[in-house]
Amino acid sequence: MSVYTFHGWPKPDELAEKIGSDEQAEIIIIAQNWPESLTAQSPAGQIIVQLWVEARIFWQHQPVFSYPFRYAGKFILIQPHVYEQWVQFNPGIVCTSTTPVYSEFRYKPWLTLPDLLPIKSVVVIGAGIAGAATAFALAKRGIAVTVIEQHTIASAASGNHLGLLYAKISAHATVQTELLLAGYGYSRALLSNCLPTGQGWLDCGVIHLNYNSKEQQRNMLLANQNPQSKLFHAVTQEEASQIAGIDLPHSGLWWPYGAAINPLSWIQNMLRHPLIQVLTTTKVNAICRQKDLWQIDCKNQLEAFSLNASHIVICAGAESNFLYPVAGWPLHKIRGQTTTASIKQEAVQPHCALSANSYITPQWRDKLCFGATFHPNQTNDDLTSEDEKENWQQLRQWMPHLAANLDSDNPLQGHAAIRCDAYDHLPVVGPIGDTSAMFKYYAQLRMDKNYPLTQSCPWLPGAFINTAHGSRGLITAPLCAEAIAASILGLPSPLSVHLQQALHPNRLPIRMLTHHQSFAFAEQTK
């Protein structure tokens, strides 16, 4: 796991010679723009050029842009003005500067990263997209991982027949837009590396329709701001209909690299790694710190047993805040249900996925998938006729001709699950601090949220979380899994400091302090 840093773009042939056959190379390039042209003479250099050409499609001038490289490495392009700041928030990366670059980060020690801890073993709790991607990010770098799943693989929020991979972004610079753009290319490349096209996913593209004036304005702004973008471009109603192969009622924004993915196929592929052991139908009853290790008390259908690990990563979605050390943390639960249906034999199916106030995919394994419903604070994960009716009503409203061509006479078909979300609709990703200790150390924040505290964060050694991806897990969870692996292994983070802090788990308990709120966090049970 060697890190190669370049100030400016290296020549592809020279880079290929330098890294040789290193499958875990971490390549950092500090540069403001992409080179106008890329050429190489050697076969290895030409492969690097091809990768960079693919990656450039997804680059949108982000401060930190990451893209998978070879089997277990990555390529990171960093804007020069954020480089020193980014290095200082990356334990394990050599920092030549002794002066903090941005003083506004100094009084938020709870939003930093802990020092590295020697790895003895890793347990990941949850076998959805977040848990599988986290385990895979570690396993492909030689770390053995045990994944514990209370039910079966991809049975909760990752259990839809098909989900969409595309980025519904704002026309303005927001944290969520930065995250979605960062995750889009990363997920797309990782997916392509894991599964051949057609085996668990459709390389079909996505049209986001201008189904109301607000969406039309947003999509027009995006297209006008990025006229040369290969990532997306505006299409007229006629052009959209030609792409989709069916008559569409609106113009829209065409995302040619969007995809429709069967999450189970992708998750199973990642969990097949030989260094990953998966324990399904296994409930975690308790987690506690014993000497220098975490003890995870489990029970399956046959026996009760315990596992020990130097590192734990909680990826349990809506079940996450039932587990120490984040038990009682303020995470929101949102019920969602998708519907599947067959298309009538004489009808023409859409050639691409369509998105409006809901979505519909092309056919995969004889079923199209559409929805989904959105019901905050509901925790029933059974299929219901009410949600089925709602999905059909939405589809008939914005795509009446397509809805009429689907078979609606079958009994309930689809998937229902509980999504996990945070107050700001951003994932919760990173190392976990000791909640009770933070409440004591940072109590002054109750009186003044800007009080310049310098007390180091009381970290829980080796404890991490990757959850609260809502309905966007396919695009955000793999990138966040890479960020977790980087933190554990001391590798370069794929996230900017801005994103690291915006997603940091400790923002939740600290917000309780600054908003004069309390919640019943749990102490460890032993």
Positions of the model-derived regions?
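C-terminal catalytic lobe of FAD-dependent flavoproteins
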Residues: 406-526
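The AdoMet/dcAdoMet-binding core of the Class I SAM-like
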Residues: 2-92, 97
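Dinucleotide-binding Rossmann-like beta1-alpha1 core, especially the glycine-rich loop
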Residues: 163-243
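Helix-loop-beta segment of a Rossmann-like dinucleotide-binding subdomain
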Residues: 171-172, 198-208, 234-273, 373-377, ...
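Hydrophobic Val/Ile/Leu positions in short beta-strands of Rossmann-like dinucleotide-binding domains
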Residues: 29, 124-125, 147
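Short beta-strand to alpha-helix junction loop
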Residues: 174-183, 211-216, 253-269, 382-387, ...
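Helical element adjacent to the flavin cofactor pocket in flavoenzyme catalytic cores
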Residues: 253-307, 311, 315, 320
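Active-site substrate-recognition segment that forms the wall
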Residues: 109-117, 123, 130-141, 150, ...
